[in-house]
Amino acid sequence: MKNYLKTGLVLLVISAVAAGLLAVVNSFTSEVIAQAEFEKSVQAYQEIYGDKADKFEPLDEAKKAALVEKYKEIQDVFVAKKGDEIVGYGINHTGNGYGGSMTNAIGLLNDGTIAGFRNIQNAETPGIGTQITEAPYFDQFVGKSFKNGEVKGNKDPQAEDEIPMISGATISSTAVLKGINSILPAYEEISAK
């Protein structure tokens, strides 16, 4: 019986030390990971906005927390500025594609048009669902209107409020469409203030 207790105590001590070391490593790496994610988002918004904006600042933490509480798919919000003028907002949001969770960045301009779209992370099928990461797909978002509070999907988007749907990857492109429409009310809230 004593051997069982001794073995149990040894395992408990080893587990406690391992957990402590993991916590220490996590405390060092969490800031590095957060900074890398921030830089990846800013890079996406620099591509999305081009010369329409030159600064991307995180939205005030209290405002962001309120939005994230209300809109669960929102991960981050950026204020897009040209000089000191706010020209729009960038919203990172999640959705569920064919391969699982995806993270997208959408740039929304204060004139009611889309500055652009980029996929930040996905697990979609290579060559099919991953088309959402390619210029022929995301270039079609630029200038599309969301003035009516939503955008629509179409395989051949011609109307000002239609974004592309991909044949053979409808789940992926539907996830993008649903994600954008789900965060438009959040944009309305932050842009009205």
Residue ranges and their predicted role:
Residues 2-193:
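Flexible, solvent-exposed loop/hinge segments and secondary-structure transition points
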